[in-house]
Amino acid sequence: MTSADSDSEPQQPGWLQALGIYRHPQVAAMLFLGFSAGLPFALVAGTLAAWLTRSGLSMTSVGMFAWVGLLYAFKFAWAPLVDQVRIPVLTRALGRRRSWMLCAQIGVAGALFAMATLGPTENLLIFAGLAVFVAFSSATQDIAVDAWRIEAVSLDMQGAMAASYQLGYRIALLISGGGALAIGDEMSYSFAYQLMALLMGIGMITVLLVKEPDVPAQKGTQQLSILNDPAHWINEAVVQPFVEFFTRNASQAVVILLFIGIYRISDMVLGVMANPFYLDTGFSGLQIFGYVKTVGLFAVLSGAALGGVAVARYGLGGPLVFGAVILAVTNLSFAGLAIVGPNIPFLVLTICADNLAQGFTGTVFIAYLSGLTNVSYTATQYALFTSLMVLPGKFLSGFSGAIVDALGWISFFLYASLMGVPAIVLAWLVSKHMQLQANRQD
């Protein structure tokens, strides 16, 4: 090999250089946008369920409120509007992505204030409608934030952006979950929700400070009105994102979609049964809260940061395969805990392994999905990918309890781990395809 050939080969960045990616201003801004995206989630889920329970509602009524969260899984349905529709005044002042982020954040904050003012005992139907509006606005914010994240930086920085997003998101979940619960019990849930609404201001300030990505709307739809020519608009904004994806990826499109659907399926199937398993094993609620919220949070954030560095240093292929492997393998630690019983050190080991794997794969997979999108249809395509990622696991997790009842905990965890094997195979195939594409471009 000549020196010229050697010089022309791309060099992998060192670990210190890879870590330096977190100093980028857009990566720092992503931390606060991730916080804004994560804050409403618990407020229409676990924290809301606690408020309803404290207010004396029946378990049937409390359970029905869980359907509010389905809006997150179907956000692809209105993602084309976020991609293409201009908001009067705001879009001209802030740009396409920032205007939708700010509008959604105002919607979340306003509805949270209204929920705090009304309360569930005054008019449950209106209260439920406000909860639905919070979820809708929150899901809309997710669409816009994801689009901004993908368009704001190059592909090699998507791992760091995903890690920063996860960090902000997890901190927000801790505040709107554990923090709001504590405030609600000690003071009132109305005050807790008012405080959470005020914290949405963090995201609003961030939106006003960051730059709008320099990516134009799809030609032909930027000025197109859905009212003037709805058929043309639907074709350009809804149909074309799907056509473009299948045209660009050709025979690999089906493999990619299948991979998206099953990559994290073993983790989702197990996750819904984690707390019941801890309790059934003999751990107290205080022990679970203490270790999951402290050790678990540290582990998942560490995994997220490592995932960002791995993508910056090695690209996406290797980390995708490694992530699929550790997701399947770490599930076996739960089987070990089921054998050992209520052993605190083994509990800590299990929580660390599981959350480290979740954080790592979360970052890597978000970066991968970001690279799949075409910037002309960022919001629509990414919303479709994330919905596809969630729906199969959510569906299969509904059968987890029946499997535990029929086979027991150890067999269930072995089953959950084996469900990760197809993901490993597909991750390897996708990695090889990415490598072939890179070689052709070289």
Where are these regions (language model features)?
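Intracellular juxtamembrane helix-capping segments at the cytosolic ends
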Residues: 139-153, 360-374
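C-terminal ends and interior cores of transmembrane alpha-helices
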Residues: 99-121, 325-342
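Glycine-rich segments within core transmembrane alpha-helices of 12-TM secondary carriers
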Residues: 72-75, 159-184, 388-397
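Helix-to-loop junctions at the C-terminal end of transmembrane segments
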Residues: 75-93, 302-319, 404-405
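Symmetry-related core transmembrane helices of the 12-TM Major Facilitator Superfamily/SLC fold
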Residues: 103-109, 191-209, 413-429
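Juxtamembrane intracellular "pre-TM" segments in multi-pass secondary transporters
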Residues: 7-23, 215-255
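C-terminal transmembrane helical hairpin of 12-TM major facilitator-type secondary transporters
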Residues: 317-365
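Helix-loop boundary and gating motifs at the non-cytosolic
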Residues: 12-72, 253-259, 263-277, 281
